[in-house]
């Protein structure tokens, strides 16, 4: 897995040793960033359920101002930190340990406004809905912000989640991307 373009182009990210961490494939990552290209420079991002930090680091490479990387797995957190260091992206990166509810609560308490959320939770029922509820509850999404949810193509997400509506949907094999705003 590598950074596709931008300041960190070509850098190979360290991969997980176990199969519990499921990084976004390069094909899907390329598709995500081709969809959101444009006014996303200087964005503040959250890579929730970050795993390897793949999506957040790609966003930073393409000009995002800051990225919060969040995960509750010790292995993932260590991997994210190593990948951030390898890309020399420490200045623009904040790693937040903990489950997604605590992380979103903490960001809400800080009054953060997020331009891009990357959501790639374990494919379990209810996690997407709860993420959207908390993003709404803490008013975390910036005015022109988007939420990018990666999910199994068989698990159709609702057209409207906590008042956020689907803007675009795409599928790539067994993976689907739903973008909300």
Where are these regions (language model features)?
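Class I S-adenosyl-L-methionine-dependent methyltransferase catalytic core
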Residues: 1-181
């Amino acid at each position: 897995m590598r950074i596709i373009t931008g300041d960190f182009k070509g850098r190979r990210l360290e991969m997980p040793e176990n199969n519990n961490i499921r990084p976004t494939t390069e094909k899907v990552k390329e598709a995500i960033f081709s969809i959101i290209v444009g006014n996303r420079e200087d964005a503040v991002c959250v890579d929730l359920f970050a795993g390897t930090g793949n999506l957040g680091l790609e966003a930073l490479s393409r000009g995002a101002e800051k990225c919060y990387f969040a995960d509750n797995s010790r292995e993932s957190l260590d991997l994210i930190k190593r990948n951030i260091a390898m890309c020399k992206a420490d200045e623009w990166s904040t790693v937040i340990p903990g489950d997604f509810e605590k992380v979103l609560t903490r960001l809400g308490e800080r009054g953060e406004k997020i331009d891009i959320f990357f959501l790639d939770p374990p494919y379990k029922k209810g996690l997407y809905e709860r993420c959207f509820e908390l993003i709404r509850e803490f008013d975390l999404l910036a005015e022109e912000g988007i939420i990018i949810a990666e999910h199994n193509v068989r698990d159709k997400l609702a057209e409207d989640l906590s008042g956020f509506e689907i803007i675009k949907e795409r599928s790539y094999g067994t993976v689907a991307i739903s973008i909300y705003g």
